[in-house]
């Protein structure tokens, strides 16, 4: 999203650099005062949380060694069977570990076999297989290929919806079509093309006019374009549609309203209000990585580096216990690593030790395509 992808990759580092320069000037003038944000705080020494998390990962992997042997046997069975459900399950497990090339290999040659009484399950498998094949290129540094493949999945679902026999089958393919459309919009956002994303989000809003998520995503697209007024209108629409759901609204939907409010405040440089909104969103169980990352951004701009550090460290440490398909795994990103490196320079008594603890943890949990050049040496 706008703030998570842009602010964390450059703004935190630039703010920290300014603070570092200011400290150097203070020390050069003979004051040598340590700023309050430079002290180790009750949350724990910088890097300590990640050192603990690394130990937990090693212990878990030691227990999982036998399971890996079972996985290898499953892979052989999948290759022989070629059934979509088995291949999809195997690929998802590999993707959760960041083993994307192996996940792609698990899907190669997989096909859907038709059972006489199992057409609905076969349709689900067809869609899941196609969607995963469209997802994988993005993780293998082929963003354009992933976008094109997801567009093809959308076209397939639209065709099946038109040709389906029976209202139930037609509705099922429409749901899959809309899921593919959300995937296309998301890839346009990731590719810094919010205008193209809005075309798809507009179509989704017409197809599902009571779904708040489409208006929320449109608001973030407007933020990417610097259109605060457009974002405000979209976020207000999402909030009203969430309220209209009444008790049927989930905690996740209510949390998204608060996250949207935080994004709006952050982009408008209203940092205390942004922090309050993000904190409320996370209290509601908001799991989107952007909420925690953007809360860390707001904390930096609000002059609270220790809170920013604690948020980023906890986001990384949460990966240890995250489910295989959890959004929490997206927290492992070069921008988070770079920003923690910058923050450690000002908040750690021993920046080198804190960075080593983080690097050790990242090496244990990062996917195979992770850009290791972001790691401090």
Protein language model annotation of sequence segments:
Residues 53, 79, 95, 100, ...:
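Inward-facing hydrophobic residues that define packing positions of alpha-helical scaffold repeats
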Residues 82-85, 89, 128, 132, ...:
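"A position-specific structural signal for the A-helix of alpha-solenoid helical repeats
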């Amino acid at each position: 999203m706008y703030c998570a992808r842009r602010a964390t990759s450059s703004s935190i580092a630039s703010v920290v650099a300014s603070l570092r320069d200011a400290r150097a000037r203070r020390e050069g003038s003979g004051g040598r005062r340590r700023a309050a944000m430079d002290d180790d705080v009750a949350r724990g020494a910088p890097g300590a949380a990640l050192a603990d998390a690394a130990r937990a990962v090693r212990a878990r992997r030691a227990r999982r060694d036998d399971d890996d042997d079972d996985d290898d046997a499953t892979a052989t069975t999948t290759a022989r069977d070629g059934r979509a459900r088995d291949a999809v399950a195997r690929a998802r497990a590999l993707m959760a570990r960041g083993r994307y090339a192996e996940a792609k290999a698990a899907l190669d040659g997989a096909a859907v076999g038709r059972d006489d009484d199992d057409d609905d399950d076969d349709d689900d498998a067809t869609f899941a297989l196609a969607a995963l094949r469209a997802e994988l290129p993005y993780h293998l540094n082929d963003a354009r290929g992933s976008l094109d493949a997801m567009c093809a999945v959308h076209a397939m679902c639209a065709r099946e919806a038109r040709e389906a026999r029976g209202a139930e089958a037609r509705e099922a393919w429409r749901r899959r079509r809309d899921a593919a459309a959300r995937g296309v919009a998301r890839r346009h956002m990731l590719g810094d093309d919010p205008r193209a994303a809005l075309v798809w989000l507009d179509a989704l809003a017409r197809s599902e006019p009571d779904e708040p998520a489409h208006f929320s995503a449109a608001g973030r697209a407007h933020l990417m374009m610097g259109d605060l007024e457009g974002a405000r209108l979209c976020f207000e629409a999402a909030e009203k549609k969430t309220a209209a759901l009444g008790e049927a609204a989930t905690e996740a939907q209510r949390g998204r309203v608060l996250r949207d409010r935080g994004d709006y405040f952050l982009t408008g440089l209203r940092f205390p209000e942004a922090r309050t909104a993000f904190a409320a969103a996370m209290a509601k169980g908001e799991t989107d990585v952007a909420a925690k990352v953007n809360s860390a951004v707001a904390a930096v701009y609000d002059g609270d580096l220790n809170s920013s550090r604690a948020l980023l460290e906890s986001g990384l440490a949460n990966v240890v216990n995250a489910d295989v398909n959890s959004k929490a795994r997206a927290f492992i990103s070069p921008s988070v690593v770079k920003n923690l490196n910058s923050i450690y320079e000002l908040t750690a008594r021993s920046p080198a030790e804190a960075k080593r603890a983080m690097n050790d943890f990242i090496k244990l949990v990062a996917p195979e395509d992770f850009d290791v050049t972001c790691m401090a040496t």
